[in-house]
């Protein structure tokens, strides 16, 4: 590599670093016969001579970006699905959405676009974990849950609850009397035989139904120890006497399988920089936002992403004249993190222009399976480009 080529590469790396730090690049007039999109590695969406090949690269970049934002190395290997009845029941009970006649889960706020209203400053992840069991006794059962650790992040548990279904069997009661039982939930230390009471609750039963038991402190303690498996001993005093059947892990009662719901909050928050931008409509060549929709079914990801059904991987394109330069932008975006990576391969980095980059990003809510078949609802920040500007 000669000196000129080496200087060109170093200039490109320096320019890329400035963009990722959100710094404003000094505008440089483009060479004759070229457009700003030809000379800036982060400006525009350059239509190449082989659109099919680049479309494939683009989709692979989208996949890598989504996995990165979910803090996953690879997509989950879904070899056996969580029983549909159990999943549907959990989602319905949590009012997370509804199930259509074709079996698809429909959640109004998970349509692949940003939700209305101000962005959440404290994104909350919701994890639904279904119970497994080691022992099937009539009045005492040991349940265990594998809980996603959300990419080994430090999580603060906002709320956690165990959902347990109590079924009433035929029983003759005196007039005016009710079935009253006491449910005790114990945390079992996996390394010792020690256990301690997590929650104790009196339940006054009129009919079969779901009951919740607070588990916030137990889950927080589990996360602080860096563990993922939660072992619980469940006892029901009075259940045999009053013909009350707690439903645990029964193949004939999959819709009533116990589940654990954990709402956890990430500590780090970042402020977003906002600026009103243009929409690309084919009538302007200035910096604007171009919408781009990816259907998860077409890329084979609908088996592990429950909702939304697709992703608006919007990007920024267009020219940035000198009078538009200097507008601050954000580098933590789909545009700079994904599109630049594969676009740089065919461009000459010898010159750097003011570039069209995202200036407003929004949160995307996702409902998906992790590697342990937990259902995770997560609000992922900085996923969708809302507005673009020059920097």
Curated annotation (Swiss-Prot):
GO biological process, one term: negative regulation of insulin secretion
Region: Disordered, residue numbers: 27-47
UniProt keywords, alphabetically: Cleavage on pair of basic residues, Disulfide bond, Glycoprotein, Growth factor, Hormone, Secreted, Signal
Residues bearing glycans: 77
Disulphide linkage map: 280-288, 287-356, 316-388, 320-390
PANTHER family cross-referenced by the UniProt entry: INHIBIN BETA B CHAIN, TGF-BETA FAMILY
Protein family (similarity comment): Belongs to the TGF-beta family.
Subunit structure as annotated in this protein's UniProt entry: Dimeric, linked by one or more disulfide bonds. Inhibin A is a dimer of alpha and beta-A. Inhibin B is a dimer of alpha and beta-B. Activin A is a homodimer of beta-A. Activin B is a homodimer of beta-B. Activin AB is a dimer of beta-A and beta-B.
Protein name: Inhibin beta B chain
Biological source species: Gallus gallus
Lineage: Eukaryota, Metazoa, Chordata, Craniata, Vertebrata
